[in-house]
Amino acid sequence: MIALIQRVSRASVTVDGEITGAIDQGLLVLLGVEQHDDRTKLEKLAHKVMNYRVFSDENGKMNLNVSQVGGSLLVVSQFTLAADTGRGLRPSFSGAGTPEQAERLYDEFVAHCRAQGVPTQTGRFAADMKVELLNDGPVTFHLQV
């Protein structure tokens, strides 16, 4: 399971002209599911996302997590993160989870984050989405479990 997280001042996702999720300060989480992902990997990645210290403390050091700054998550499904780009000029998605598996784990990831008390907004699974963000930094990390 892969999460590309970006520290944002604000972010939103729009589907068919309708905003489905929007946050102010927090993390935009692009979430990719791979074939062998399961609940254990989901919980490990969710814990890492929610506790990753990417926000600055009073000394300017990245030492605070999203909850400590009163931030939110915007979680967007992104199967292209599971692409194999090692050969050729066209990505292969053979390692990506099935749509059914990916949707189930995406929904569980969102529910897990919400259950931990982190305000969490979403896009719409498998939809053509328009994502807008104001990247703060920029600060971007690729997390994989």
From Swiss-Prot:
Highest taxon of the source? Bacteria
Catalysis: reaction(s): glycyl-tRNA(Ala) + H2O = tRNA(Ala) + glycine + H(+); a D-aminoacyl-tRNA + H2O = a tRNA + a D-alpha-amino acid + H(+)
The UniProt entry lists the main location of this chain as cytoplasm
Pfam families reported in the protein's UniProt record = Tyr_Deacylase
The subcellular localization recorded is: Cytoplasm
Molecular-function GO terms, alphabetical: D-tyrosyl-tRNA(Tyr) deacylase activity; Gly-tRNA(Ala) deacylase activity; Ser(Gly)-tRNA(Ala) hydrolase activity; tRNA binding
Gene3D superfamilies according to UniProt:
D-tyrosyl-tRNA(Tyr) deacylase
Q: Which UniProt keywords apply?
A: Cytoplasm, Hydrolase, RNA-binding, tRNA-binding
* Family according to the record: Belongs to the DTD family.
Record text on subunit structure and interactions: Homodimer.
UniProt name for this protein: D-aminoacyl-tRNA deacylase
Organism per entry: Shewanella amazonensis (strain ATCC BAA-1098 / SB2B)
